Amino acid sequence: MKTKLPTEWQELSDQLGFQEFTPIQTQLFEPLLAGENLLGVSPTGTGKTLAYLLPSLLRLQKKKAQQLLILAPNTELAGQIFDVCKTWAETIGLTPQLFLSGSSQKRQIERLKKGPEILIGTPGRIFELIKLKKIKMMNVETIILDEFDQLLDDSQIHFVEKITHYAPRDHQLVYMSATTKFDQEKIAPNTHTIDLSDQKLDNIQHFYMQVDQRHRVDMLRKLAHVEDFRGLVFFNSLSDLGSAEEKLQYRDILAVSLASDVNVKFRKVILEKFKDKQLTLLLATDLLARGIDIDSLECVVNFDVPRDSETYTHRAGRTGRMGKEGYVITLVTHPEELKKLKKFASVREIILKNQELYIK
């Protein structure tokens, strides 16, 4: 990397223990700093947030009276981006503000009056503020679409298209994604692509446990009794999630689900308790777990074999973040599931190990 980081960032890096750039951070830095339109693809847990934030903040610092807009598919991810951005931006004199659906619009309008250089939010709320003429897109030089594949899945792309329509014709547009499950030529033509989706996460170990379908909750209970164990458990269905939560709590296991009817505020409380190790198991579906970012999470458990290899990779990336050690355990109930799991492992070049743990 040619560009030298500001002294303030070098000091902050030492404080945070940020020692070296990951591959995606290294490869995105100069193109983003130069203002290129770019698609960056890298698995979950490889440092994509800082990969686009650091060069974009430096570029913004040099361009007075301009703004940076970051769109995320959900409130949790937007909040996490804001927290990271605030840490790095304020040391070089830049101010971020957060704009979420479900939060007080009046307060958000008051924040805009303070003239923040960085706007972070969900597409729906950002578009509402544009229509109210509270956000003036003529000042936005760079738009970053984080977890772009999820923005497509959530059908928020129509908001994104309307937002970009209001931006200056020569604005910089950056797509960040964990997968490439979309037609790039159709959606992001003539865009510089840096695709590290095949990057191996060698710091994550992968196991499977063969268990009778009726004993899967018992297996979770047994794992929860392992000393210092803490795991994020993924379910393919809400009905299995609800049933498992009820059975685990009945047996005094500290397990809580991110149910769809949990409001944003309480959801944040649950996540904080899990991060603080006050909960042993956090139960979720892929949809409910979007935006979860827990740096020190050591284990992901698949209650069911995921539907496809990309889902498996996305779940696995919740652990072993930024080079830390992690492991994934998948519960397998019959031979066809094991065959499917081994196919995922072959596609992703993962070493899959059988972990025997018998229910007593």
Which residue stretches match the model-derived regions?
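Conserved helicase RecA-like core
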Residues: 1-360
